[in-house]
Amino acid sequence: MGAVLTQRPDLYQAVVCEYPLEDMLRFQKFLEGPYWVAEYGSAENDAQFPYLYAYSPYHHVKAGAQYPAVLFITGDGDTRVAPLHARKMAARLQSATASDRPILLLYDTKSGHSGGKPVNKEIDEGVDTLSFLLWQLKVGVN
């Protein structure tokens, strides 16, 4: 979602990014990232760098752009995608956006990337996600 968010922010009213991979130039340096080089490529490879840079969401946040409302979801227990991706992307968007729409970070210090998350945490996250979307899309609930 990060790539479409930075490429065409005008197309969306609200975006939810769950456990996102946002910095395509440094992903391979954290957690499971080295295992994804075969799929994504590596910024350390001169031939692959331009392709990764071209769609790396973090590197295409533009100051003054009208970004939609965004909810990033991550947590300390994520052993796949480093939580730093969501944290730094949220901070960058908060600093750059010219819109009055919220850029929020839902951060759980005890759980992470799906599997192994207690059912009550899954439910809470689902409620938070749907509530955010209903709020930002101005959907009335009777």
Where are these regions (language model features)?
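Active-site-proximal cap/loop segments of hydrolase catalytic domains
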Residues: 1-142
